[in-house]
Regions:
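Catalytic core of soluble alpha/beta enzymes
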Residues: 46, 51-183
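Structural signal for conserved beta-strand scaffold positions within catalytic alpha/beta enzyme cores
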Residues: 18, 144, 199-200
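Active-site pocket-lining/capping segments in soluble small-molecule metabolic enzymes
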Residues: 177, 181-215, 229
Length: 252
């Protein structure tokens, strides 16, 4: 049985997005966004930081119109920046991801009260109690679930179920996984609560040659189709792993 079916997944075809870092120029950012849109990706996430925020997002909106666009701040701001976030409401972004410190949900709740754009928590969510607290105090309206951070499939499903029952959208984040980790992210993203495009992309976007076959590919519709083969659904290229290994340990 495929892993995604074993987990109770319902969406075999999952929508994909990409994350684009801070560039040397806005023109370079435009080029990267266009490349990803041409590749079929449905949602564009751009990193924002002081000095690379309002004007950049404004130019991206002007050039690309109503694409699905979000900003990821990686905790780069404080409550002193409320006015900035209020100004950026005009761009109708999908969300601001982790705008404030990862360990201060109360500040996020304060910010969310002052802006219209949904806040998405990422680094703040390590467990179901974290998600419960964030939702209860109004610290976010969206959650980014990272499988490795929350402790595996069981915990991820518990969190996604909790969020789904409270109409809090969830999406799958990425942590620069190889094909094996990516296969697990794909399986997780088929769960019912995962309703927004996640950071699950094609193997070739990060790897010259992945350690699984076939490589993960994105369709022209900007989706990934979960495999029907048993387990993670991909064959592990052990010869490739052996070639790349720096050190090995045998347990048991």
């Amino acid at each position: 049985m495929p892993l995604w079916k074993h987990l109770g997944g319902v969406n075999r075809e999952i929508a994909c997005g990409v994350s684009i870092g801070i560039q040397d120029s806005v023109e370079q950012l435009f080029d990267k966004i266009q490349t990803e849109l041409d590749a079929g990706y449905r949602r564009i996430k751009i990193k924002i930081a002081p000095g690379w925020d309002y004007d950049v997002v404004k130019q991206v909106r002007k050039k690309f119109g109503r694409i699905l666009l979000m900003g990821d701040a990686n905790s780069a701001y404080t409550l002193n920046d409320i006015d900035l976030f209020q100004k950026m409401d005009e761009f109708k972004l999908m969300m601001f991801e982790q705008p404030l410190a990862y360990d201060d949900m109360f500040d996020h709740a304060k910010l969310q009260q002052e802006i219209k754009t949904p806040i998405c928590l990422d680094e703040s969510i390590h467990s179901l109690p974290d998600a419960r607290k964030a939702i209860k105090i109004g610290a976010c309206k969206i959650i980014n679930l990272k499988l490795g951070r929350v402790g595996g499939h069981k915990q991820a499903k518990r969190i996604s179920n909790y969020c789904r029952q409270r109409d809090i959208p969830v999406w799958s984040g990425g942590m620069l996984e190889s094909g094996i980790g990516r296969a697990h992210n794909i399986a997780m993203a088929t769960l019912e609560g995962f309703t927004l495009p996640g950071d699950v992309s094609a193997s070739k976007r990060y790897w010259h040659e992945d350690i699984i076959e076939p490589a993960v590919e994105v369709t022209k519709k900007g989706t990934i189709v979960a495999p029907e083969k048993p387990g993670i659904g991909f064959a592990i290229k052990r010869d490739r792993i052996d070639k790349l290994a720096v050190k090995t340990s045998v347990i048991g």
